[in-house]
Amino acid sequence: MPNTPQESMEDVSIAYMQGLCAYNGYTLSIERRDNDGVDITIKCKGYPSTTSGCLKYSPTLDIQLKSSFARFKQKRNGDITFILESKNYNNLVIGDRMTPIILVVLHMDRDRKKWVKHSKSALKVTKCA
């Protein structure tokens, strides 16, 4: 039986982040259990780059991933808001975390056939994070 649309969206969001990490030379670890609002962790060996502005050696970043096509609202000025459950928000705003955490939201198209396109010359993930 195929994955549900939500499970597939989660897989696409992980693949999207994996592609960005691979391109930039970072490692991505998928958390086995989401007990603390963390879905993936990104690590960099050494200093990220001279232009990144990061002055820390071997930085680590925890990420809570979300993917949706329905929980977005676009404001008149073009800004986009995302409806986030309070428990997820509360996990993100804890001030004394050892490792910083951010929310990454992949905006999916309603048409599942448009999520990922592949051919001999390209692999394309549509919409944006």
Describe the role of every protein-language-model region.
Residues 1-36, 42-129:
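Mixed-charge (Asp/Glu-Lys/Arg
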